[in-house]
Curated annotation (Swiss-Prot):
<protein>
    <recommendedName>
        <fullName>Single-stranded DNA-binding protein</fullName>
    </recommendedName>
</protein>
<dbReference type="InterPro" id="IPR000424">
    <property type="entry name" value="Primosome_PriB/ssb"/>
</dbReference>
<dbReference type="InterPro" id="IPR012340">
    <property type="entry name" value="NA-bd_OB-fold"/>
</dbReference>
<feature type="domain" description="SSB">
    <location>
        <begin position="4"/>
        <end position="106"/>
    </location>
</feature>
<dbReference type="GO" id="GO:0009295">
    <property type="term" value="C:nucleoid"/>
</dbReference>
<comment type="subunit">
    <text>Homotetramer.</text>
</comment>
<dbReference type="InterPro" id="IPR011344">
    <property type="entry name" value="ssDNA-bd"/>
</dbReference>
<dbReference type="Pfam" id="PF00436">
    <property type="entry name" value="SSB"/>
</dbReference>
<feature type="compositionally biased region" description="Polar residues">
    <location>
        <begin position="157"/>
        <end position="176"/>
    </location>
</feature>
<feature type="region of interest" description="Disordered">
    <location>
        <begin position="118"/>
        <end position="176"/>
    </location>
</feature>
<dbReference type="GO" id="GO:0006260">
    <property type="term" value="P:DNA replication"/>
</dbReference>
<keyword id="KW-0238">DNA-binding</keyword>
<dbReference type="GO" id="GO:0003697">
    <property type="term" value="F:single-stranded DNA binding"/>
</dbReference>
Length: 176
């Protein structure tokens, strides 16, 4: 049987994403996710929090980094990677998750942030971005507007929420 290195996590961002560039010009997005775990200890429930460092390379990381805001719920898919280095004569190592896909599942306040098909993923964002602008997002907002609003308000991919007509619509149908 072949070895398997596959990780899937759902948690909340502990801080805003950090976007850096390598000397060769490659984008590197770093962020951390907290995952709560409840377990029974005798008659009581004990909550434990685990923290995981995540990296997302390339165009996907570059584009989605602006939406990775502290408190947002995300799903991360990737693999474990171990970095090793020497520091002051001591061998050091760190295990982090190298993400292949990141999906925004909810806002800081718990509402869903969705795009066309109900998901807002890093691979979809990278494919749909043109000239630094992400389809289905407002130019002045860090949250996706999505086609849920766009279809009902007459918005297209280059519109912002400021251009929408909210006067005669039932806003209770918006899922966030």
């Amino acid at each position: 049987m072949a070895d398997v290195n596959h990780v899937v996590l759902v948690g909340r961002l502990t801080r805003d994403a950090e976007l850096k560039y390598t000397s060769a010009g490659g984008a590197l997005c770093r962020f951390s996710v907290a995952i709560n775990r409840r377990r029974k200890s005798g008659d009581d429930w004990v909550e434990e929090v685990n923290f995981f460092d995540i990296v997302l390379w390339g165009r996907q990381g570059e584009v989605i980094s602006q939406y990775l805001i502290k408190g947002k719920q995300v799903a991360v898919e990737g693999e474990l990677r171990q970095s090793r280095w020497e520091q002051e004569g001591q061998s050091r190592s760190k295990v982090e998750i190298s993400a292949t896909n990141v999906q925004l599942l909810g806002s800081v306040l718990g509402g869903a942030a969705r795009a066309e098909d109900g998901e807002f993923s890093s691979s979809r964002v990278a494919a749909e971005s043109t000239a630094g602008r992400v389809r289905g997002t407002s130019s002045d907002s860090r949250s996706p507007t999505g086609d849920i609003l766009g279809e009902k308000r007459g918005l297209d991919a280059t519109s912002s929420l400021d251009e929408a007509d909210f006067s005669s619509s039932d806003l209770d149908t918006v899922p966030f």
